[in-house]
Amino acid sequence: MSPDQLVVEFDRALRTILAPARSMRPLPGAALPDAELPAAQRSHVAGLMRVNHCGEICAQALYQGQALTSRDPTIRDALRSAADEETEHLAWTERRISELGGRKSFLNPLWYLGSLSLGLVAGALGDKWSLGFLAETERQVEAHLNGHLRSLPEDDSRSRAIVDQMRLDEIQHAETAVRYGAAELPSPAKVAMKVMAKVMTGVAYRF
């Protein structure tokens, strides 16, 4: 990697972790009325959205690592395009956390570094395995978001609109990875990913 590329990637990391994210698409549910939630429910929803925001931090780092090690320019461009959509998810979840009076995870820098490392390793294994890891990640995120939709209050239409649009985007990302030749990961790898995700979501919900 050239010094210029190193600066660009470092700037990308800093902006992801520290700078307010921006979205080219409208915020889902922005025109809907905000629900009058009891304090306990607001805290719960803020925790769920913090987990989702943390997940998008991880997605940015994962895509960055995979793009850096991809051998195929077409796949690299697809990863960058998906990362742009994940940036929109960052903006949406950040906005909703603020509306709920919540805060982002204190551990975002650690989540970012860990996910960047995973992305670099996945990419180094070759594009088909890197894409397989990406596809499985997105499938597990979809399942996670389905769980959040079941957990969110029925009248919290704003949060539900954000989570549902994120879910649709993640489905599309998984389908894109498969279209570009993603390999099916072995079952032990899928189980390990689920365990790691469960630890991350549990910690991010609280911290």
Curated annotation (Swiss-Prot):
One Pfam family this chain carries? Answer: COQ7
Query: What cofactor does this protein call for?
Result: Fe cation
Pathway listed = Cofactor biosynthesis; ubiquinone biosynthesis
Q: Record-annotated residues binding Fe cation 2? A: 86, 138, 170, 173
**Membrane topology type, per the record?**
Peripheral membrane protein
Can you list the GO cellular component terms from the UniProt entry?
plasma membrane
Please state which protein family the record places this protein in: Belongs to the COQ7 family.
Query: What is this protein called in UniProt?
Result: 3-demethoxyubiquinol 3-hydroxylase
Q: Which organism is it from?
A: Dechloromonas aromatica (strain RCB)
